[in-house]
Amino acid sequence: MKALDELTFDNRFARLGDAFSTHVLPEPLDEPRLVVASNAAMALLDLDPAVAETPVFAELFSGHKLWAEAEPRAMIYSGHQFGGYTPQLGDGRGLLLGEVYNEAGEHWDLHLKGAGMTPYSRMGDGRAVLRSSIREFLASEALHALGIPSSRALCVIGSSTPVWREKQERGAMVLRLAPSHIRFGHFEYFYYTRKPEQQAELAEHVLNLHYPECREQPEPYLAMFREIVERNAEMIAKWQAYGFCHGVMNTDNMSILGITFDFGPFAFLDDFDAHFICNHSDHEGRYSFSNQVPIGQWNLSALAQALTPFISVDALKEALGLYLPLYQAHYLDLMRRRLGLTTAEDDDQQMVERLLKLMQNSGVDYTLFFRRLGDESAALAVARLRDDFVDMAGFDAWAEQYKERVARDADSSEEQRRERMHAVNPLYILRNYLAQNAITAAESGDYSEVRRLHEVLSRPFEEQAGMEQYAQRPPDWGKHLEISCSS
């Protein structure tokens, strides 16, 4: 394991030059202090977890100190926001400190969010508040633990720096890790500003560093786009299967690597609601839970438009046509596993859709239903779950179909089925009310609840003694909370 001063930097994006980003120094926070750190994320950098408790750790990730090899840069990009094109966005409060490569040969961006004003801050102050920083930290690590592709979060550093939003709050910084922070909006920026040389340089950078296997294909850029389509289809399939609502699927929030990125007013479903809107600024429901699948395709088409200098329109359309079949295949595979099934049958999609409609009409807790379905035999489980449904006759009909399907599928013992289902059906998810409880405590200086919640969510499939309160249905006040983009 390494100390903080032993990290090895290789700042590949910074070497692209000033057309792609601007050198900016972070603005330090007052009286920085560690709120929470992820041992699993620190392991990606080969860091000894003990370094999180040292004073220099808080100083490095609050803007007070920098590694000599760091090259902090604010990236420039544009994007479609709620369907309308915004010509220039960029890192308005985040800085790419540099890229660190670990002993496994992996490169990880170190991105400090809340680091102060940049040339792209527009009307913002460049700061992030403790509330939003804790939410991003918890979500990043929770999604990773669920097996959903995501950026990672190393730590949150709190402070006494005042920041004004709807009210006065305290400033914080979160250190985000990802193999790359390049977004769909990077390509859109150079396409719409008609800078073909820089756009070609960016495309080569992404191809060589992040999709090198596509170099071997007859049309490398087309192969890369197909891979981006597949990764996004798989990511969104996992969002839908686990009930994750992103909230702000603008193209500047879409990673070129197909990982969940830029956490804002996100939420996991409590009661199943296909039309749930987690962002109270989304008045039209553009980014509602059920719209995430078509919006994923819309965003990929926006990226495709920006790639027309490298790929023919017909080839791009053909690649985009792969999205929905790929999504459906990934989604149905995961939903079969959540139902404890190991084989595929033609009627499985209809059976899943029928169940979700029943859950919608009865307000059934999405996460706990699947967990309890695997607690015992199919017959006993559905008998116990029956009372959760208003339409009992409808549920009984579904239950008969399900039991027959399980009987045809059965090639293992009940214990093996239970273990298989519990391995894909979490007991603990990041419910908004749990995050809010942790934030409320942290805002009064008590970080123990944030740390405990993080630890619980790092093992979502494993029953943890004494942590029953994290596996309950939310109280009425905690259901379907709408979160603002104010962060």
Q: Where do the PLM segments sit?
A:
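N-proximal short alpha-helices
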Residues: L7-R15, L112, G116, G126, ...
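Conserved ATP-binding subdomain of kinase catalytic cores across diverse folds
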Residues: E31-L34, A40-F57, S62-E216, L257-I259, ...
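ATP-dependent phospho-/nucleotidyl transfer catalytic cores
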Residues: S133, P162-H246, L257-K357
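Phosphate-binding glycine-rich loops and adjacent basic patches that engage nucleotide phosphates
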Residues: M1-L7, G17-T22, G98-E106, Y120, ...
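Residue-level detector of functional hotspots within protein domains
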Residues: E6, R15, F20, E31-R33, ...
